[in-house]
Amino acid sequence: MIVDFQFKFSIQQLNNSTPLNTLIVIPARYASTRFPGKPLALLGGKPIIQWVWERVSAMPVEAVVATDDSRILEAVQTFGGKAIMTRSDHHSGTDRCGEVLLALEAQGKHFDIVVNVQGDEPFVKQEQLKLLIDSFANPDVQIATLKKNINSDEELCSPNNVKVVAGIDDKALYFSRQPIPFVRGAEFKDWRQKQQYYKHIGIYAFRTEVLKKLTQLSQSQLEKSESLEQLRWLENGFSIYVKETAFENIGIDTPDELAIAEQALKQSHTNSLF
């Protein structure tokens, strides 16, 4: 079942006046191992997926939720959102985005860029989405994502905060759940004074032809080791541009993180970074 889900957002390439058509997809699955039913869990009295939808749809564009569960589909329709049912055997949100893209193309639609905003990112900012989309003004960009500076040792140590290092050209060199890089000859307590660390903000944008190729790749050993699908892309020679954002995101993977998000929501009126 497909419910009107075309999202178009035009940007101008620096050396090309042709606008790029962008599709944004919000993957949301019910059967999360750590938090079953997560998209429908209440945050500030509304389902998490509704927060994500409202953040994205506040832009003067359309968006779509891609789900494999009728309960999520019905919830989205109830609060006035737009959704599509997808297969239940996808290994990642990226694969789910790929299915949506193919469904649209089968209807004769054309898109240049697909943006993947996970359904557990209730604090996603429009500024972050624009930063990603604007990066495709560079015709060399295949994949774009975000990073934010790490401000505490707790953030640096947590395996739930994925760390990223990038080259001077903004291309990712590696992602890890461990603190990277290692600072030789220094005590851990001094690492952040000697090295700037960044955590990965898991929002992606892809050129459509690249997304199609990514969904055809087999899992890689590095991906399995770290449980990070973006390592599969790096291992297969794709470049990931990493842009820095000042805005904090709180993804929700567990009930404990939902409690943290509740506190952040209460404080959000005094903190412009949310």
Locate each region found by the language model:
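Conserved alpha/beta core of the MobA/IspD/sugar-nucleotide pyrophosphorylase nucleotidyltransferase superfamily
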Residues: R192-F274
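Short phosphate-binding loop-to-helix
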Residues: R71-V117, E121-L131
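N-terminal glycine-rich phosphate-binding loop and ensuing alpha1 helix
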Residues: L20-T67
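Conserved core of the sugar-phosphate nucleotidyltransferase
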Residues: K125-L217
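A conserved hydrophobic position in a structured secondary element of the catalytic/binding core
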Residues: T67-D68, V124, F206, D253
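Short, basic, low-complexity termini and linkers enriched in Ser/Thr/Gly/Pro
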Residues: M1-P19, F274
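Short, high-confidence coil segments that cap the C-terminus of an alpha-helix
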Residues: P60, K109-F111, P139-V141, F238
